[in-house]
Amino acid sequence: MPKRLDINTILVIGSGPIVIGQAAEFDYSGTQACQSLKEEGYKVILVNSNPATIMTDTATADKVYIEPLTLEFVSRIIRKERPDAILPTLGGQTGLNMAVELAKSGVLEECGVEILGTKLSAIEQAEDRDLFRTLMQELNEPTPPSEIIHNLDEAYGFVNEIGYPVIVRPAFTLGGTGGGICHNEEELIEIVTSGLKHSPVTQCLLEKSIAGCKEIEYEVMRDSNDNAIVVCNMENIDPVGVHTGDSIVVAPSQTLSDREYQMLRNTSLRIIRALGIEGGCNVQLALDPYSFQYYVIEVNPRVSRSSALASKATGYPIAKLAAKIAVGLTLDEIVNPVTQKTYACFEPALDYVVSKIPRWPFDKFESANRTLGTQMKATGEVMSIGRNLEESLLKAVRSLELGIYHLELDHLKELDKETMKKRIIKADDERLFIVAEAIRQGVTKEEINEWCEMDFFFLQKVENIVNMEREVKANVGNMEVLQTAKEMGFSDHYIAAAWNKTEREIYDMRKGNNMTPVFKMVDTCAAEFESATPYYYSTYADENESIVTDRKSVVVLGSGPIRIGQGVEFDYATVHSVWAIKEAGYEAIIINNNPETVSTDFSISDKLYFEPLTIEDVMHIIDLEKPEGVIVQFGGQTAINLAAKLEEHGVKILGTSLEDLDRAEDRDKFEAALTKLGIPQPVGKTATTVEQAVAIAEEIGYPVLVRPSYVLGGRAMEIVYRQEELLHYMKNAVKVHADHPVLIDRYMVGKEIEVDAISDGENVFIPGIMEHIERAGVHSGDSIGVYPPQSLSEKLKEQIIEHTIALGKGLNIVGLLNIQFVVFKDQVYVIEVNPRASRTVPFLSKITGVPMANVATKVILGQDLVEQGYGTGYHPEEKEVYVKAPVFSFAKLRSVDTTLGPEMKSTGEVMGKDLTLEKALYKGLVASGINIPTHGSVIITVADKDKEEAMEIAKRFHEIGYNLLATAGTAQSLAEQNIPVQVVNKIDSEDYNLLDIIRQGKAQFVINTLTKGKQPARDGFRIRRESVENGVACLTSLDTTRAILRVLESMTFSAHSMKEITQTKRHEVVHA
């Protein structure tokens, strides 16, 4: 059936900011879909609130709206643009929920807009737990015994009948938000209450736990002619009970018999047909390991995280084809873009094994509960490809960016058998490492299987790795053993430690013995047809399939998995750099290992290597390709950290030289450079021992800002107010020694300014200056950023521009640089300089129209700024006001403190733009998920240091009609200022107290600042967590509170009696 000609304009709904459960995979799928629809000649309009994505580039669609994904704003765009149809199935859960809201509000009917891809009825049947269960019963497909509940009493009724454990699955939520497994009444009350709150339709499914079954996923496609295929099936190494986004997954499935595979395949195809889905769909199934009994867990009637993984695992571009199917094309009409010979109706075949391991944020949030369950906690993931499962798993382990090179963690060696048993039964992020450790200590596979029901096949593979470790240690220098270890995926790093050599010595030993990997192609058809895609993975085998051309090439290092501090912004910069390399006439080669991103789409670069970003894996590619050089500026800290080792191997680092990178990152060298340039910075020194740190802090004077050198996202950064806190930090947060010094700075409470610039060594061009709403001390990634600056005098702006130009030239920067300044007592100080792409590059590129990563790449390749039409100086400011607001995923991470500080906590960002700061702020805050009601109650509990400042804020809330609630201490201060306030009980009171008010939704905002010294923070911590669990905006910075007040004041009219007005006027005259 040819494509539809009765529709011309299609509105694509994006997925909004990156949160846990919805990451960069939707930038990849959304970008693919928009391009796919444009190829077919449709006019594409995109709405998305996330400025950090390729998807929101103006070239991706015919019209791009970066606006909040709320009913109010999307309806407005629909009424203005009058599209013929909307495509919501590529915007994750956000897109689906938006489609349902739009349909229910009547705006689609009013404007005659059709939903493409998955019909509304199918979305509701798949997402509404009750309708889905009914459909499964009609199809005779087994689901676990379950009950739909809308309150706690109904939950009790089900549990009394069926017994514990039970699984709670809220309807219409993302990444299992609010759900979990309940083993007793206490957990039932907590999880059901949370689930009902998070479900937009106040509905949960309670089902008998089938934890322990194998969890299998099928990624299926169907078109309007009822052709349906399986693109990929995947198996979770973790049995049912751990969210699939938190599971280690392999593709294709490894432990199914042909009968089991076909049985589950038929079920998946029967379900997609019954739902009438046109496009992609993900079916999750549970299989009893001891019989042919299976259960349908759930269906995602959209492109999902698993479809991004399946696309990268097979090379079959699901989102691209789903978009074509949505407009009427059928699988037998669409050519497979990989082979360019076969059609899309051929099911992909794999002759390799793919492993995906999630990347969790527990290195950032040490206090978080690390236990894994049905609510997702990972921020991102890595994928690797190998010829056997051992190789594939070990490659994935070293891709995680945790400084791990093998399935082994030193701190687990101390664990006794009982502790290991507990942690294997109750899964956490280190379970696979603990399984390996247990096998090393002699625990049998049978015992481990009894503890966690992980399949014997997977346990055998881990045992194979452990046995090989013993072989390696027993045969130092043996080349045959080395060959076998390399075929199994062992790293040079591991072997070097076992043989008491350096990694370089092992590398040289292998090269001397011709023991190097070859590169195989990912071709969707197990080499049955010739493939046209340059998409490769390494393995130790015979034939190399990566053909080196005679064109000059440049390698770009990607940024690895999405994690807090290094998000999709770096992928954005990587992709733009690759495009610029191609424009400059070079062959662009990319190395990365993140299956969710646009950069690992094989159509982006000339060659894609899906490999770990370690020196060994990168050098294999460089040895083969012999590029002109490597660009490290766009891959965040991941790539920068490889620069020194690459140079040791004789590889040319393009752009800012290694020496100059080091000058910006090394404290003492940086200080010397600033002194030479005459640029002031806060007083600070470097400590390499605890005693030194104490002495420096005494000399500088508290409060001080402490942090390790060479970090991204403010890892382990803290503001310390007294000596015992400093000692606690030195003991717990960092391991200080000569190679890992700790930086100690005077903490200045001033306005923070951020600048991104491009330098070619001679000229320094500044596209934009951003002002942070929160004072210095809150990490720049967690601050609300405003462009152009709203409160900087021209004199200060000139100072900032002068300092930026001097730093660009003085540090010999070639490419991008990011500088953070603090304005303190009308003086500009430099806090830090990052000689690389920063997380504000996409935001500023979109606002100013300067394609920063593109321009910087061309500068790196030798085309100076003047040649490109830019000179030294500041780009003219835009008329509109733009706000970048952070988005957090606290609802997914229990027991993480929400207080903002120098360590970054946000997972994503949104943009708000309008003619005034207030309107732009309103859009930014609403897009980030903060509800802004114009009246209600605000709870104020602030630290003594903030009381004076909080008075002015409280007064302004009162003036716009808000009711103020406070505990005794704060209430007294308010009463003394004649501000009406209602006293509420502290949280340790047995009577109705502050937490009850939050739980019952009687407060719209909670203002809670941290007491100096962090110890009495436990009360504050409970208040902040309770706010998050109940969806109440909790403001831990008075600057953010002021920003919200500006918005509220602009939306509401203050009401003053005439007498008040005349008194104010008389007052003004007296002062005249």
From Swiss-Prot:
Gene name as annotated: carB
Function: Large subunit of the glutamine-dependent carbamoyl phosphate synthetase (CPSase). CPSase catalyzes the formation of carbamoyl phosphate from the ammonia moiety of glutamine, carbonate, and phosphate donated by ATP, constituting the first step of 2 biosynthetic pathways, one leading to arginine and/or urea and the other to pyrimidine nucleotides.
Region (Oligomerization domain): 402-546
Region listing for Carboxyphosphate synthetic domain, in residue ranges: 1-401
Residue numbers spanned by region Allosteric domain: 930-1072
Family recorded in the similarity comment: Belongs to the CarB family.
Keyword Kinase among UniProt keywords: no
Name of the protein this chain belongs to: Carbamoyl phosphate synthase large chain
Residues that bind Mg(2+) 4: E832, N834
Residues engaged in binding ATP 1: R129, R169, G175, G176, K208, I210, E215, G241, V242, H243, Q284, E298
Residues that bind Mn(2+) 1: Q284, E298
